Amino acid sequence: MIAFDGKSLAWERVWQDDPPLDLSAIVARRVYVDARDGARIPVFIAHRMDLKQDGANPTLLHVYGGFNVTVEPFYLGSYSSFVNRGGVFVDAGVRGGGEYGEKWHEQGMLAHKQTTFDDTIAVAEWLVRERYTSPAKLAVEGGSNGGLTVGAVITQRPDLFRAAICQVPLLDMIRYHKFLIARYWIPEYGDPDQEDAFRWLLRYSPYHNVRTGVNLPETLVVAGEYDSRVDPLHAKKFVAEVQSNPGQLSPFLLYMDFDSGHGTGKTQQQRVVDRDYELRFLMNALQVSGNR
């Protein structure tokens, strides 16, 4: 906590909390990844200082990319176990978000929404190319609009990811506007009842792009039964569609929370339990071991 003295015009640090985690062995840095069209995507990477770029590191790519929301760099305590076991945590500011203002947002909305997914794929490919990881050790995670991003990239590039965590997602983009408050998102995604929007939405709608005979990455889809924003039907029907695909060999799981909504209404203890479940899924899928 910092106080400002209006008379002396001086700043004074009056209180500082001790960090709850020992981060002395962790390094974080920002890099820029070239998108398909030459745009520079800001990417934050956190990992242990002794990391070797040998292509064998379990890596989690976190994405959102929508509604002009800026996802600021963060290091949640819940990721510390993953990183301390040799994992790499990556946060990518893909287009559709607000990292560089409204223009950055506009380049990833409506008819340009595919740009959000192309940026995510570009970052994933860069991580592999720079030997942080490999497709066999790479996972992608996102919630809400970020869940849509996850659903899109795993259906478009299932070969690029080993696993995915898809939280409270939109996945049926042809009927999304018919449920709950989603009609208010038409300015962001487009109106499926209009022919031009219908065409671009159908091209990337994850539910409509589950291909027969194609095995999607091992995935945990998380939804809340009382979600008042994104109807849990998206998660339920998507998982059912994938599980009915005879070519789906990897586990594709639905985790329903019958006591919560869009990530809200949970006690601290419930959030800890849920995050523990997700991270155990992640570590099992990426074969993370160790006791740190």
Give residue ranges: language-model regions.
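Conserved hydrophobic/aromatic pocket- or pore-lining residues that grip, position, or stack substrates
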Residues: 1, 33, 43, 61, ...
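A fold-wide structural signal in alpha/beta-hydrolase
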Residues: 59, 83-93, 253
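Active-site-proximal cap/loop segments of hydrolase catalytic domains
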Residues: 91-292
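Conserved helix-loop functional segments at active or binding sites
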Residues: 49-51, 66-69, 126-130, 244
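Short hydrophobic segments within beta-strands
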Residues: 46, 62-63, 141, 222
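Glycine/threonine-rich flexible loop motifs
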Residues: 68-74, 99, 233
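Active-site glycine-rich loops that stabilize anionic/oxyanionic intermediates
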Residues: 57, 64-69, 144
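Non-catalytic accessory segments flanking enzyme active sites
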Residues: 1-55, 69, 73-80, 84-85, ...
